Amino acid sequence: MAITIKATKREGKGTSASRRLRRAGNVPGVVYGGDKEAVSLEFNHKELFLEFRHETFHASILNLEVDGQKEQVVLRDYQLHPVRNTIQHIDFQRVSASEKVHVKVPLHFINADIAPGVKLAGGIVTHILTEADVSCLPKDLPEFIEVDLSNLEAGHSIHLSQIKLPNGVEFVQLAHDNDAAVASISKPRGGAGAEGEADAEGEAAAE
């Protein structure tokens, strides 16, 4: 079920007006895109933050309700206070059912515990990317993408081109010939062979 966020049109603009909004517990924002003009908005911070803190809010089609009228949007940008971690400003972009959107989608890594590089070699998994930019129609937008590490060996990486995507979804980076590494498994320091040699040397010294 799509998340619905409520807003009202914002009359005052500029730094002073935005400060007054924040002091009153609200967040200045804007919605733009499509064949409509940009509209300045204000949101109740408490209500907005309850949804904002969830991962799905950042990578899904949202219902934006402004003065009773709903339209579909995606989160495009936001600013957080460096100390209080409150939302200072937020931007949304309108979407059309017939036009592709570019959205950063979270990567969920699975089966790391059974990867040969971990289970057999004792390697350590490193997540190089935690999200990736995808292109698709709004109806095909996934909330997250699974990255299966079950066959990954120590000393190797898994790249975008090796990840299975839902139908209709593609990685933007691959369209620009950038097959970025997503995760890797580093070999244990010294390696199993080195440990064996060390044990043998210790036994010889004891004799």
Swiss-Prot record:
Disulfide bonds: none
Pfam families assigned: Ribosomal_L25p (PF01386), Ribosomal_TL5_C (PF14693)
Chain coiled-coil ranges: none
Gene Ontology molecular function, alphabetical: 5S rRNA binding; structural constituent of ribosome
Keywords, comma-separated and alphabetical: Ribonucleoprotein, Ribosomal protein, RNA-binding, rRNA-binding
One GO process term, biological-process aspect: translation
Biased composition annotated in UniProt, kind: Acidic residues: 196-207
GO terms for cellular component: cytosolic large ribosomal subunit
Region (Disordered): 186-207
InterPro entries given in the database record: Rbsml_bL25/Gln-tRNA_synth_N, Ribosomal_bL25/Gln-tRNA_synth, Ribosomal_bL25_b-dom, Ribosomal_bL25_C, Ribosomal_bL25_long, Ribosomal_bL25_short, Ribosomal_L25_dom, Ribosomal_uL5_bac-type
PANTHER family: RIBOSOMAL PROTEIN L25/GLN-TRNA SYNTHETASE, ANTI-CODON-BINDING DOMAIN-CONTAINING PROTEIN, RIBOSOMAL PROTEIN L25_GLN-TRNA SYNTHETASE, ANTI-CODON-BINDING DOMAIN-CONTAINING PROTEIN
Homology family: Belongs to the bacterial ribosomal protein bL25 family. CTC subfamily.
Physiological role: This is one of the proteins that binds to the 5S RNA in the ribosome where it forms part of the central protuberance.
Quaternary data: Part of the 50S ribosomal subunit; part of the 5S rRNA/L5/L18/L25 subcomplex. Contacts the 5S rRNA. Binds to the 5S rRNA independently of L5 and L18.
Name the record gives this protein: Large ribosomal subunit protein bL25
